[in-house]
């Protein structure tokens, strides 16, 4: 009986929103590190990154070329592009980017952002 009560308590704690938010923050933090290691070489800030340059040409300023600035990406979209590749971007096998790592990268790229409709702080 004590085991059942302990298991139930553990499930309730794991189901709490605070726990889910902490787990998501951990995935986002891991995803940021993985993105910097695996993706930023092509999709990072600065001149000469082929992924960013290609997206600048494709979108012509209508959508951010820097993936980290996009707010319209879904986890499914990130997974499709990484697994299938597109244009000059190669596909990545599960031996190159594991499913768990890809989930973390997707969590980072689709993380909630502060609302851009919030008023700017007044100048000092």
Task: Show where each model-derived region lies.
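C-terminal capping alpha-helices of c-type cytochrome domains
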Residues: 82, 93-124
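The canonical Cys-X-X-Cys-His
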Residues: 31, 35-46, 105, 109
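Conserved beta-strand positions that form and line the central face of beta-propeller blades
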Residues: 65-66, 88-91
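Electrostatic cytochrome c docking/interface patches
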Residues: 14-34, 49-50
């Amino acid at each position: 009986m004590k085991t059942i009560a302990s298991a139930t308590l553990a499930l309730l704690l794991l189901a709490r929103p605070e726990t889910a938010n902490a787990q998501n923050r951990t995935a986002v933090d891991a995803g940021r590190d993985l993105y910097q290691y695996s993706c930023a070489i092509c999709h990072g800030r600065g001149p000469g990154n082929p992924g960013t340059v290609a997206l600048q040409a494709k979108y012509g300023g209508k959508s951010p070329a820097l993936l980290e600035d996009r707010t319209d990406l879904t986890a499914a979209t990130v997974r499709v592009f990484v697994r299938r590749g597109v244009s000059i971007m190669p596909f990545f096998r599960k031996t190159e980017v594991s499913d768990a790592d890809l989930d973390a990268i997707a969590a980072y790229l689709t993380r909630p952002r502060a609302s851009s409709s919030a008023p700017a702080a007044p100048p000092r």
